[in-house]
């Protein structure tokens, strides 16, 4: 295997993990360790008409490719930038007569690039797609069946005039996608819109309490001169001080679960046994399953309440999928009432309920009640998450907005400031989310100052402003969680 070179990091053999990356210099919180453009990336099947196929921004009006009628772009700039990667895809779709699923499209794009450039390492690339882990040998019976279907479909889609690859190599690429696919989000970071392969990122090992985070940046093509454009990329950012020689890690999954469940999830999705400190020592497990102290409920009562919470979550998922949001609120209220005397405020079953009910009530514009639940949710999250966790920052931001809409100006402003401080580390000052949050911070600070000077006049102006302004910050509730870092084929 050929290993490339890159400033700031180097490949090494991590004990018990295989390959990994370590820092070659010292880093501090918010430092960008490296940025990487996608080797190949595609939009999810369900969003191909709503998301630009170049920068992955969600837009209302998109330009459609006049030949295949499939690809969509923000403008001519994005369409021109996409042509190198879309050219083969365009003719293949026309020949095949239909559009294959996202996995097939991504595999084809990867192999067209291999055909075009070979598998040698380019500048700044540490590893080729040929040398990424595929874990095909660990696939279960169902996964092997899905793989055979994908390979068969790929062979029908792949043009006969293109370079022909072996079945083993095609299977390897599908395995790479399965294990190394990175979720791409829209420009607001609120919705997963696609999946991409970033070879250097594939070398960064997992830790449930990592020292880095990965953020997707859609880039910016708004400047008139192309020399000022920035490209779509991922950024590996430091969450705190990282010493020279220290291994760089990210979390492949959400931390908010007990260690055994996280280990089970990692084994199922990524085929390894997590040996991080938090899993080995079961750190914070007592908080995740926390119960009230005085009086302390019996083990039998706790067991029954956990099962009741799981059953209620299933009912909630069904109601949400059917758009029955008032039913969701009713189920959450009933469950929280029963959880209250049993679970502590950090219990994951209570936090899941608080998250759902605050989100749905915000969507229904019942902001006063939503703000109460959102504050409780944030209080629990702050005791569990890493202080610079991106998901914590997003949750605090949403809670701050909910409280602002409820008229809790001081609480809302405080939360927005806290979220802004976190996102400066995890996303950086130039990310669209951080820019939006900075605008909100300035606005709430101005309103807070006005509120303290003349409360009566403030409420008159606020009422007038809200009546003339459509809601833009509360999206329709979704069964999908916040976008996960790494994409797992459903």
From Swiss-Prot:
InterPro entries: H3K4_H4K5_MeTrfase, SET_dom, SET_dom_sf, SMYD1_SET, TPR-like_helical_dom_sf, Znf_MYND. PANTHER family: HISTONE-LYSINE N-METHYLTRANSFERASE SMYD, HISTONE-LYSINE N-METHYLTRANSFERASE SMYD1. It is found in: Cytoplasm; Nucleus. Methylates histone H3 at 'Lys-4' (H3K4me), seems able to perform both mono-, di-, and trimethylation. Acts as a transcriptional repressor. Essential for cardiomyocyte differentiation and cardiac morphogenesis. The SET domain is split between the S-sequence (residues 1-49) and the core SET domain (residues 181-258), however the two segments still come together to form a conserved SET domain fold. Zn(2+) 2 binds at residues 65, 68, 86, 90. GO terms for biological process: heart development; methylation; positive regulation of myoblast differentiation; positive regulation of myotube differentiation; skeletal muscle cell differentiation. The lineage of its organism: Eukaryota, Metazoa, Chordata, Craniata, Vertebrata. A zinc finger (MYND-type) spans 52-90. Zn(2+) binds at residues 208, 274, 276, 279. One of its GO terms (cellular component) is nucleus. Induction: By serum response factor SRF and myogenin. SRF binds to the CArG site and MYOG binds to the E-box element on SMYD1 promoter. S-adenosyl-L-methionine binds at residues 17-19, 135, 205-206, 270-272. Zn(2+) 1 binds at residues 52, 55, 74, 78. This is Histone-lysine N-methyltransferase SMYD1. Pfam families: SET, zf-MYND. Its EC number is 2.1.1.354. Residues 7-253 form the SET domain. Interacts with HDAC1, HDAC2 and HDAC3. Interacts (via MYND-type zinc finger) with NACA isoform skNAC.
């Amino acid at each position: 295997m050929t290993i490339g070179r890159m400033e700031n990091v180097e490949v090494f053999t991590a004990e018990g993990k295989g390959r990994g990356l370590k820092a070659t210099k010292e880093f501090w919180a918010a430092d960008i360790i490296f940025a990487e453009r996608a080797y190949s990336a595609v939009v999810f099947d369900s969003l191909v008409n709503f998301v630009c196929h170049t920068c992955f921004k969600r837009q209302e009006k998109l330009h459609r490719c006049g030949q295949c009628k499939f690809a969509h772009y923000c403008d001519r700039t994005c369409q021109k930038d996409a042509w190198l990667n879309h050219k083969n895809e365009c003719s293949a779709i026309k020949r095949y007569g239909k559009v294959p699923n996202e996995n097939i499209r991504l595999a084809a794009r990867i192999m067209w690039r291999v055909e075009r450039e070979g598998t040698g390492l380019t500048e700044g690339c540490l590893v080729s797609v040929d040398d990424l882990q595929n874990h095909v040998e660990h696939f279960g019976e169902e996964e092997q069946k899905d793989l055979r279907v994908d390979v068969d479909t790929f062979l029908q889609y792949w043009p006969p005039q293109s370079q022909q690859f072996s079945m083993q190599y095609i299977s390897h690429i599908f395995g790479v996608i399965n294990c190394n696919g990175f979720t791409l989000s829209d420009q607001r970071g609120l919705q997963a819109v696609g999946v991409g392969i970033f070879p250097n990122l594939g070398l960064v090992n997992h830790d449930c309490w990592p020292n880095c985070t990965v953020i997707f940046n859609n880039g910016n093509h708004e400047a008139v001169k192309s020399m000022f454009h920035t490209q779509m990329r991922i950024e590996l950012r430091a969450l705190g001080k990282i010493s020279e020689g220290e291994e760089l890690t990210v979390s492949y999954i959400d931390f908010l679960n007990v260690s055994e469940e996280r280990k089970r999830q990692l084994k199922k999705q990524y085929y390894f046994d997590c040996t991080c400190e938090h899993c080995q020592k079961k750190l914070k497990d007592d908080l995740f399953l926390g119960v009230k102290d005085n009086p302390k409920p019996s083990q039998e009562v706790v067991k029954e309440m956990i099962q009741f919470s799981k059953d209620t979550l299933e009912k909630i998922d069904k109601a949400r999928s059917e758009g029955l949001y008032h039913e969701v609120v009713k189920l959450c209220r009933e469950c929280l009432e029963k959880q209250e005397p049993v679970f502590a405020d950090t219990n994951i079953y209570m936090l899941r309920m608080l998250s759902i009910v605050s989100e749905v009530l915000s969507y229904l514009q019942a902001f006063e009640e939503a703000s109460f639940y959102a504050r409780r949710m944030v209080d629990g999250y702050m005791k569990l998450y890493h202080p610079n966790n991106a998901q914590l920052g997003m949750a605090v931001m949403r809670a701050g907005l909910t409280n602002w809409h409820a008229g809790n100006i001081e609480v809302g402003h405080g939360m927005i400031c806290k979220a802004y401080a976190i996102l400066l580390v995890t996303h950086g000052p130039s990310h669209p989310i951080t820019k939006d949050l900075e605008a909100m911070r300035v606005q709430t600070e101005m309103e807070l100052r006005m509120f303290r000077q003349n409360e009566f006049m403030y409420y008159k102006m606020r009422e007038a402003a809200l009546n003339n302004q459509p809601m833009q910050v509360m999206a329709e509730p979704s069964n999908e969680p916040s976008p996960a870092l790494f994409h797992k084929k459903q």
